[in-house]
Amino acid sequence: MQRSINIISGQIPCPNTPGDAQQTYWIIGGLCAAGIDVHLYTFKEEAASTEATMDGTIDPTTDPKLLEICASITSYPVNKGHRNFSFSVPYAAAQYQNGQLVNDLAKNNFPILIEGMGPCSLALSKKLTNKKIWVRLLTFAPGYFGYLQERSKAPLKKLYYQREAVLSKKLLKKINQRVQWIVPSVSDKTTLENVFLGGNISTLALFNNNNTITSKTGLGNYCLFQGNLADAATHKTAVWLLTHVFHNLTVPFVITGNNPAPALIELAHKQPHTCIVANPSAPERIDMIEKAQIILQPSFIKHGPDEALLEGIKMGRHCITNSKTTGSPYAPCYHQGSSASAFQEIIIQLYHFPFSEEEIETRKKIIATEKSNTALTSEFANIIWG
């Protein structure tokens, strides 16, 4: 019997944007390669609700491969403005509430996978009462907003992020009885269990674009930080590196990623040794990783290595993250610093230290234990269909 699944993503899946959009792209690719029909429901700003299929209208912002492999793609507008304000739902979730999406999902009997907290409030709709729904959380939203609250200086922003943290926790608790969860690690599972005092929670490791090491030996040319710069937390991490690490460390530092804010662009070009490369193509981004001497990927929210750090391990030379990344099998592949000054000390030690063949061999042995996307797809299918 032909298997089909509805996947809901708050953003258009993209292989060139580390984070949720990238993970959604790879899980769709794995499912389609396994012969499973994927019906993708996604959001974009200032868009009318349109459907894109092999025979239908092609959304120019959608990756051509998605149009080729998905059974259907339907996009909806992201809600903006004060009308999204609610005393019970965080703004981050209210902007994805859409009655037409609920009606479209009610038309079939396929299981539903919601990617991230954003669109998850639709699980409360009475029209979807009889649906089997899973929510895959790659980031624990209350912790995410708590980090933004801590890093924000403006009182109103602090209050806003505090409110988002409280409401997102309430929302996750509210839908816990309605959905099943998928998280990337045992530590993430423990976090949810402590919040929900139970719940149906499965673990599924992060998908990846390759299981090979292409790192080059010798010396690179600069330090690099990369990520989804449109994301508030990634933006603040980039600002932290500029203002706390490279403000008085005159080592070449490059930031790259999609849609950086004008303020970040201005800050990155204030010093002669720092710069930003906005919206690189996939080949350009890979080239920057391969030519870097040090990959910097602090992780202030997630417990384990994120997608950008894993890319650095597989394609780059020396990698540095912070001390919150603990208990990881990838630990031999990176250095850890607990503070800005610790980052500076490690950078000074490594910047003129050639990357060796021995270090590459260590990474190859560790990466060899990774599960392939094919194996992860099989695990996912077992979670959904048993």
Predicted regions and their residues:
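Short N-terminal targeting/anchoring amphipathic segment
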Residues: 103-121, 132-134
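Acceptor-binding helix/loop patch of EC 2.4 sugar-transfer enzymes
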Residues: 78-91, 131-167
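Acidic donor-binding loop of glycosyltransferase active sites
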Residues: 290-304, 317
